[in-house]
Amino acid sequence: MSKEDFVNLPFFVENGWIKRTCPVCGRTFWTLDPERKVCGDQPCEEYSFIGRSVGVKPESLSATRKMFIDFFEKRNHTPVKRYPVVARWREDVYLVGASIYDFQPWVTEGLVPPPANPLVISQPSIRLTDLDNVGKTGRHLTGFEMMAHHAFNIRDQRVYWANETVEYAFEVLTKVYGVKPEEITFIFDMWSGGGNAGEDYEVIVRGLEVATLVFMHYKTAEDGSLIPIENRIVDTGYGLERIYWLLTGHYNVYEAVFSGVIDRLRKLSGVEKPPDDLMYRLALKSGRLDFKKPLEALETLRNVSREVGISFEELQRVLEPNEALYALADHTRTIAWMLGDGVVPSNSGAGYLARLLIRRSLRLLRRLQLELPLSEIVLWQIQYWRNDFPEYLELQDEIRDIVDTEEERFEESVKRGEKVLGALLGELKSKGLRVVPAEEIVKLYESHGVPPELVKEKAESEGLEADITGFYSRLAEMRSRAQVQQKEALQLPLDPSRLKEFRPTRLLYYENEKLAEFEATVLGVLDGKYVVLDSTAFYPEGGGQLSDTGVLVYEGGECRVKYAFKVGDIVVHECEGNAPPVGARVKGVVDMERRLALMRHHTATHIVLGALRSVLGKHVWQAGAQKTPDYVRFDFTHHKAITPEQAKAIEALANRVVMEDRPVRKYLLNRTEAEKAFGFTLYQGGAVPQTTLRVVEIPGWDAEACGGTHCDRTGEIGLIKILGFEKIQDGVVRVVFKAGMPALEYVQGMGDKLKNLQEILDASYEGLEEKAKSLKSRIEALEKEVKKLREELLKGGVSVSPVATVQGVQVYVYFSDEYEPREAALAISRTRTSSVILAYNSKGNFALKVTDDLLDRLDAREIGRSVCESLRGKGGGVRDLYQGRIDETKSVDKVIVEALRQALERR
């Protein structure tokens, strides 16, 4: 179809629709109203549905959704359950931003069949790129449901296309929702997103866009050009909340959707609802508000204030607390969706976006002077939407705990960050700067947790400026698209393109995971050591599992396989010794002790993951793993340190599954069928770029898409021993454990150490703990005594000579591992004036003291920061004493002298 064909659809041409060009925006649109001149979209026309009857009056948002789904189900569309808001099946995005995200790229590219065709869905979606508009414009939401009907015309299959799609949209609006035909306009345009593009129609009713109908038949190239594809996808999106708002005629979408939560917040905060006249006039113009263009938005608000007859300042005083209420109501539902679908707040990925939203919500709470915990409001949302999202009810305790933990961390980080902010503002003022740089505001938020609102508030109190317009939106936009981690390229002296001449390797390790010996033919030898076989039982490194090793035996010799790796469908064996000739038959012998250890550890990983989710909660997701013959290092998402009781429970549960000797099933499934059967926990190890998935299932416990080698039954593992847990970054915890013989050897080693300790301490097994406590008490008492003696010695003074004198100020540098740097610096300063003292030790810990008589001229913090910059360190302090740690200690003398000289010159 040409562009003209999409514009002149039979539905319009044959049913009396009038085609016009909007004189305001210049776009082509269709209407049944002969009097209509403009397209009806914003900003071409004001809203005209506020306070008016537009169609039927649904009793709830749920009823509005049901009406839509029922309509399409009666027209042979299969209802499909919503997908999680976390797009774990994709590598390019973190969150689902539209219903089509559920089917990109696998279904849209025709690689796997859709779950139904055609289908209807109502998909919760999250978009944070308009975050600064939420609560202010009346229409923007961070979380919304996109109702959609999709048809997948894959290759030669025809379901339906553009004409039928437009007709369906017209019917659902008029026959289901009761909208008058002449009040609907269809605006023609182009759309792109998620790597695809196509012509589209925006559907407008009384100034409000309620749907977008996209006819996806292009792929977007990296340079932005459009490449036609053979598949034609009907991608529609109907805003559930917007349609409900349209039909109820509320002043804004927040009052329509979140009235129950907003009413509770009003009662607790004492924020009064603005007068109806003001709300009505503002609502009519709110479609034109966009705070990404602050000057235009403020001018619109000034016009409203003039119309209502109040000052602009009074308008802002009335609106600001209400905007905070609206934003808080929106944010807390989105937080419930994110945490309920497994996001753990952190400093990266989807966790970063969850933290961003939680911290913004906490600032809104403070602005409203509400004392209740943020988690309380999130739980209101879960209860309020319990019939729509019943799956979140069982996660309430988990979600409360996560939000409460985030709130505690936020308060702590703000307290710490205020000191950093104060130092920064002081530094800017000392340099004569009047504006806080944008990059510093981002750094304060990301590194120290200081909200931009606080930066602006403190900066203005110091006579500085801080522009935070659109801060949250920009930050969310920067972080919304996944930075696809490039897997480490194989460090080979050969070009992988040289492998193209070889056919795919037959993977014997999948046919029989305990196959120790096999025969194969040599297809090629590259650079004398990289051997390609027609089939192999050597598992190549992948999925966090190390490769097999062993030998290749052939007539006249043998070589050792020290590493195996996979390039595409070809397994390459890196050999030591004389490689076999091309065409030779070889016998491969796999090191089965290593293979079995790897199998036990990999299967144990699946078991431990199930135990982690059972004990800690469903928010636990794999964040990285390495399986070796001796141990497993497994990283997972979690928001708190693991308690000893939890560690014991996890280990006990994992070993119970081992002792139950459950079967471990391994089979191939079509991607769509696998997702239907097991959901998206399949992708614990990350997105799998394959149309057919190898599923490893421990019935009733765990099922994952996994390409590793595994035991046939859990009992083959023997024993799982957890060595410990540690937090490796915010929101990510690491567990290290052993399985099989390494676990047994570890336990035996612990027993040996206990026996040795009994001998050393001359204590029985039962009395060992008491003896250790007694020794610890004695050591602590002795350490206190030693400290007192050191302090007495320091009172007698420290013999040290100045290393330099700068403008009358003497510089002392003192090195000692015997005394703490702070104690030494203070001791030296007691007997000296007009001095700067730096004491440090071999660990790089240092203290910098400025004597009291110099405090009107010098600041230890200024000198200390300069020292840290030069010697790769960091620290903090007060005007007379700065403490920290430096990585380099060789040139301390020169650096402190230069730092002092610069500080004096600035005075």
From Swiss-Prot:
PROSITE patterns: AA_TRNA_LIGASE_II_ALA
Cofactor: Zn(2+)
Keyword Aminoacyl-tRNA synthetase: yes
Annotated Gene Ontology cellular component terms: cytoplasm
CDD domains per record: AlaRS_core
InterPro entries per UniProt: aa-tRNA-synth_II/BPL/LPL (IPR045864), Ala-tRNA-lgiase_IIc (IPR002318), Ala-tRNA-ligase_IIc_anticod-bd (IPR018162), Ala-tRNA-synth_IIc_core (IPR018165), Ala-tRNA-synth_IIc_N (IPR018164), Ala-tRNA_lgiase_arc (IPR022429), Ala-tRNA_ligase (IPR050058), Thr/Ala-tRNA-synth_IIc_edit (IPR018163)
E.C. number: 6.1.1.7
Sample GO molecular function, one term: tRNA binding
GO biological process: alanyl-tRNA aminoacylation
Cofactor note: Binds 1 zinc ion per subunit.
Enzymatic reactions: tRNA(Ala) + L-alanine + ATP = L-alanyl-tRNA(Ala) + AMP + diphosphate
Main location (coarse class): cytoplasm
Places the protein is found: Cytoplasm
SUPFAM superfamilies xref list: Class II aaRS and biotin synthetases (SSF55681), Putative anticodon-binding domain of alanyl-tRNA synthetase (AlaRS) (SSF101353), T4 endonuclease V (SSF47077), ThrRS/AlaRS common domain (SSF55186), Translation proteins (SSF50447)
Positions bound to Zn(2+): H602, H606, C706, H710
Enzyme class: ligase
Assigned keywords, A-Z: Aminoacyl-tRNA synthetase, ATP-binding, Cytoplasm, Ligase, Metal-binding, Nucleotide-binding, Protein biosynthesis, RNA-binding, tRNA-binding, Zinc
Its job: Catalyzes the attachment of alanine to tRNA(Ala) in a two-step reaction: alanine is first activated by ATP to form Ala-AMP and then transferred to the acceptor end of tRNA(Ala). Also edits incorrectly charged Ser-tRNA(Ala) and Gly-tRNA(Ala) via its editing domain.
Domain remarks: Consists of three domains; the N-terminal catalytic domain, the editing domain and the C-terminal C-Ala domain. The editing domain removes incorrectly charged amino acids, while the C-Ala domain, along with tRNA(Ala), serves as a bridge to cooperatively bring together the editing and aminoacylation centers thus stimulating deacylation of misacylated tRNAs.
Similarity comment: family membership: Belongs to the class-II aminoacyl-tRNA synthetase family.
Protein name stated in the entry: Alanine--tRNA ligase
Gene source species: Thermofilum pendens (strain DSM 2475 / Hrk 5)
GN (gene name): alaS
